[in-house]
Structure formats: structure tokens, C-alpha cells
């Protein structure tokens, strides 16, 4: 007698256009093809609903190369049935999001920002029953480049839509939330701190059967008010799984896809071209760790300093791999391509320069970046701090970080040199 397999909801989050199987400090990301193969294997075992908890279309090399367009089209090849908008889907503006959301081929949800005009919920019918999804984008307006108007009462939004889904026939309701647990990487390794996120979910968690978390690049499997929560590793490194069976408590766990090959879906030619453009070689591997040290980010800072001809430079570098071992970004020894540099820094890369006093420069050099998923790279001709120095940084968050550290405004001026151009010069 065959065993009836439960319905599984399988989700990724913060995939960030990680379509190439990029190297990491611990091995490799699976890439888009690896994810597709993992889903085929799961479907052979029984019915699944494929979900995504946001930031699938940006950031990443493919997103930057295509002006924010190809990340939406490529997602159509990942077998996703339903997803929620992450803050980075807003990176090119609300109108851009509205225009390209249909290219994904799946319902892209956004219940707590109704002005965006995307559906708040979706029903997925399977031969095991009907699953209702409510999508909640990140409730923190500070994380957006172009923030939508966010409903301040997340509880009312989630509870109301969960009730509507059940009235419409949903036997289970799953919340896709673009927010997640805080974390720290210390002497004991990776430590999740779910307290803040639990407070976000506590008023409404009872109204849903399960929650997929995301956004913070961390990992956690736990419960809020008895409701199971799964936040797998980001970048497709893991698939979060919630097993649903009528009359049974949901079961939660994660699975690890194997590494796939070159991406053959939408945007594959753009990625192949960028991968074929070799900028130079590294004699030794380089990486940056959460909390430091960050020699890879320091290397980017050195490239910016040399390209702009200033005395010092600083670079903020976000994670491009899960912090499984504390490493946030990694380049192996050997050839470095344009795609590699874009993977490490896919953001707008205009740089600015301004004057700081010697003591101020020392403070900037040792100013910790406020989030564990980013590092602060620094390089200077002379760190002794004698006299006034010109400091180059990335426009935006890095410039603001310097001003917060110094407690004053800096008279910034554009350098005319992009960070990726600077890195290309030092590599060549």
C-alpha cells in the first residue's frame, strides 16, 4: 500500500537573481538550474506549491545588466506559483514594478501596500486541498529606495485577509512575509535572534497556519504563538518546506538543492556575456566576514582610492552568500569576470569625495557597519591622521554612514568614477 504524501509548500527568499552557480566560501550556490532540478525531484515525491518570499528580481548581476527588467522575466522559469513583493522589487520605482510584475507568470502579492495595485492574496488549488496565501511586504519604510505607502496595522491586514481566504475555501492559510529574524555571527557561530520578528507577527500569527520569513538573510525554524515559521538560508541555498495535512500539525524543515549548471532561462545570454568578460586575476582567494575582517571589501576600497587619486576610501559591501560560516562575500583565486564584480556589488555605484580631518578619518576607518549582513571596507595611504584628507565613498548609504559617524554634514562632490570601473582598473 502506497503512503499518501502530504502537500508541501516550498519557498525561497532573497534569491537576488542568483542564477549562476556562484562560488562561495563553503562551496557553491545552486543557481537557477539547481533550484529547478530540486523542484523536479520534490514534485516526483508528491504535490508541492512553490512560493517565494520576495527579493527574487533584484538585486543581482542580471538585474543590473538589464536595468531591473530581466529579474522579473527570469523568475517565470523558476516554477513559482505565488510570491510576495520584497523591498528590492521596488528598486526602480512603483510603476516599473507594476509594468514588469505580469512577466513573472505568477501572482505577486502585496497586501499591506494596497496603493501599489497588486493582489493581496491568492488561492492555489491542489489535489490535496486549497492553500490560501497572504503576501506582506517589508513593513519598515526605511529599507526602500522607493517606499510605497504601507498600512501601519499589519495585524488588521493579515487577520482580515486570512479570514477572507478561509471564507473563499482555503483549508490552510500561509503568510509570505518579507521580514525575518535578526541574527549575529560570533564565537559560537551563527545565532538567530527572533524576538523583534516575533513581535511583528504576534498580533496576527494565530490567524494563519504557517509563516515564511525572509529579508534579513538569516535562517530560523521556530514558532510564534504556536504558528510554525520557516526562514531558510537566502540566495536559493535552501528551500524552506511546510508540510500540510488536514487534521495534522504542519511540519517544517529545509532542504538543500545541489549545484546546477549555466542558467538557460531568460537573461542567460546577458549573464554569459558578463561572465566571459575577464577583468583580471586574483592570486589568492578573498572574502569578507560578518563583523570583520573584510579584506575583500578593503580591496574594493583600495581600488576606489587608487582610481580617484584620493588619500582614503571606504566601501560598504552587502552579503552575496548566506552567512553559513560567517562569510558574507567571497572571490576565489583565478580569473575575475564582470559578472563576479556585479555579483559582489550590483547596486548603483556612483562615488563621491569630501574632506575630513585626520582624527575624523580614524573614526571612519573603525566605524562598524550597523547591520550584520554588510561590512565596511577601508583603505588609506596614511592612517596616522595627520592633516586634512580627501575621502571617497559610494554615494548614498556609505556617505550617510560617514556623516552619522562624524556627527556632521560633509561637502561631497561626484568623482566621476564608478566603483565597478575602479575595481576593473585595479584588476587589470
Description of each model-found segment:
Residues 12, 17-29, 142-147, 153, ...:
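Catalytic centers of hydrolytic enzymes
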Amino acid at each position: 500500500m502506497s503512503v499518501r504524501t502530504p502537500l508541501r509548500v516550498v519557498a525561497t527568499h532573497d534569491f537576488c537573481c542568483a542564477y549562476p552557480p556562484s562560488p562561495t566560501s563553503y562551496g557553491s550556490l545552486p543557481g537557477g538550474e539547481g533550484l529547478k532540478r530540486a523542484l523536479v525531484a520534490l514534485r516526483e515525491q508528491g504535490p508541492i506549491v512553490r512560493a517565494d518570499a520576495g527579493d527574487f528580481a533584484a538585486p543581482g548581476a542580471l538585474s543590473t545588466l538589464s536595468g531591473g527588467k530581466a529579474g522579473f522575466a527570469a523568475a517565470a522559469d523558476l516554477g513559482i506559483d505565488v510570491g510576495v513583493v520584497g523591498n528590492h522589487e521596488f528598486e526602480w520605482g512603483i510603476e516599473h514594478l507594476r509594468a514588469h510584475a505580469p512577466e513573472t507568470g505568477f501572482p505577486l502579492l502585496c497586501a499591506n501596500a494596497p496603493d501599489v495595485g497588486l493582489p493581496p492574496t491568492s488561492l492555489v488549488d491542489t489535489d490535496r486541498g486549497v492553500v490560501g496565501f497572504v503576501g506582506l511586504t517589508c513593513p519598515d519604510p526605511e529599507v526602500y529606495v522607493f517606499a510605497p505607502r504601507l498600512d501601519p496595522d499589519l495585524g488588521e491586514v493579515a487577520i482580515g485577509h486570512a479570514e477572507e481566504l478561509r471564507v473563499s475555501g482555503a483549508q490552510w492559510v500561509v503568510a509570505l512575509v518579507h521580514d525575518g529574524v535578526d541574527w549575529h555571527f560570533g564565537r559560537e557561530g551563527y545565532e538567530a535572534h527572533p524576538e523583534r520578528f516575533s513581535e511583528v507577527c504576534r498580533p496576527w500569527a494565530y490567524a494563519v497556519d504557517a509563516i515564511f520569513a525572509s529579508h534579513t538573510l538569516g535562517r530560523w525554524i521556530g514558532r510564534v504563538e504556536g504558528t510554525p515559521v520557516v526562514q531558510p538560508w537566502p540566495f536559493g541555498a535552501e528551500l524552506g518546506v511546510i508540510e500540510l495535512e488536514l487534521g495534522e500539525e504542519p511540519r517544517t524543515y529545509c532542504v538543500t538543492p545541489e549545484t546546477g549548471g549555466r542558467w538557460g532561462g531568460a537573461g542567460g545570454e546577458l549573464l554569459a556575456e558578463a561572465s566571459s568578460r575577464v577583468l583580471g586575476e586574483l592570486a589568492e582567494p578573498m572574502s569578507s566576514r560578518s563583523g570583520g575582517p573584510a579584506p575583500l571589501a578593503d580591496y574594493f576600497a583600495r581600488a576606489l582610492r587608487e582610481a580617484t587619486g584620493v588619500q582614503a576610501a571606504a566601501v560598504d559591501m552587502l552579503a552575496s552568500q548566506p552567512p553559513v560560516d560567517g562569510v558574507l562575500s567571497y572571490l576565489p583565486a583565478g580569473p575575475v569576470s564582470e559578472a563576479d564584480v556585479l555579483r559582489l556589488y550590483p547596486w548603483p555605484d556612483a562615488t563621491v569625495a569630501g574632506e575630513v580631518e585626520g582624527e575624523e578619518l580614524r573614526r571612519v576607518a573603525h566605524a562598524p557597519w550597523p547591520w550584520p549582513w554588510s561590512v565596511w571596507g577601508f583603505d588609506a595611504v596614511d592612517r596616522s591622521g595627520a592633516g586634512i584628507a580627501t575621502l571617497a565613498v559610494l554615494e548614498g548609504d556609505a556617505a550617510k554612514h560617514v556623516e552619522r559617524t562624524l556627527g556632521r554634514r560633509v561637502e561631497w562632490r561626484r568623482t566621476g568614477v564608478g566603483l565597478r570601473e575602479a575595481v576593473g582598473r585595479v584588476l587589470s
